[in-house]
């Protein structure tokens, strides 16, 4: 019978979905006992050894997250329940997939309290580190930590184990939808449901609908997060598979969904005064070989607006000239041309003063 454990983690003070682990005590009981005891808190020599309050001090994207140094917090400390270090129990389990829980060490037989969670298969660690568990829920939290900004592999914001302990399988809380009603894994690699072309299209469409609703409510950051999530799922099929049974019309809809999301991201970037992001998203649509003329025109309009914010009036004018003949576009183009004239006048006056 497996042991189960959990971490309630905060990132920069904000509580994340709980991570639950299944521990393999039928394979490595001594290693599991050490981890489980440190989750619950272990009294030793008048001290309580515990992961509670400790942080993840090392994060490497496409590799792993490391924590468990509750004495120094920088990867040089930690202590096991058996003493400072204990031996490698066995290497029966392999690092053959993401979300495995394994012991960090400084060489053979130097296990303490530090552990790591893999985010990809890491076979080069086989025979060197003891695998003793896996993440069974809360994978989105692992991915969120993995994608944090770091400096020298140390997250720039604190990632803290606020609460931890062991539990029974029945005590594991079912995944809860977030405030938008979305309960899907953040990354499609972690999603274990139907990944057919039509299923992915529906998932992305639903996520776009959630994002659009958040946008209408002026929850711009949430809208952006959901649109970006939809794009991650759509990237399961960046181009149709050679053996795809779906019709050309289906793939037109698929691409239209993708490009509408990029256009929306460009729009929000403009609202948030992030012109470079708007330019990046607009250019994806413009440079795509299979985007429609109408999609390109919409993107050119947003590109023109973004260049205008950067006072790149020549580039703004060029983009807006390709955005179609809508009255709103003509008005924006006239506005940019006037701003360009005013800007040149100010420059001329400034230069004239320099030589007086």
UniProtKB/Swiss-Prot annotation:
Keyword hit for Coiled coil: yes
Domain PPIase cyclophilin-type, first and last residues per copy: 6-166
Superkingdom: Eukaryota
SUPFAM superfamilies: Cyclophilin-like, TPR-like
Catalytic activity: [protein]-peptidylproline (omega=180) = [protein]-peptidylproline (omega=0)
One GO MF term attached to the UniProt entry: cyclosporin A binding
Any Pfam family the entry gives: Pro_isomerase
TPR repeats (start-end): 204-237, 259-292, 297-330
Signals that turn on the gene: By heat shock.
Subcellular location: Cytoplasm
EC supergroup of this enzyme: isomerase
One Gene Ontology cellular component annotation held by this UniProt entry: cytosol
Keyword Transmembrane helix appears in the UniProt entry: no
GO biological process, one term: protein folding
Entry keyword set: Coiled coil, Cytoplasm, Isomerase, Repeat, Rotamase, Stress response, TPR repeat
Family membership noted in the UniProt record: Belongs to the cyclophilin-type PPIase family. PPIase D subfamily.
Protein name: 40 kDa peptidyl-prolyl cis-trans isomerase
UniProt organism field: Schizosaccharomyces pombe (strain 972 / ATCC 24843)
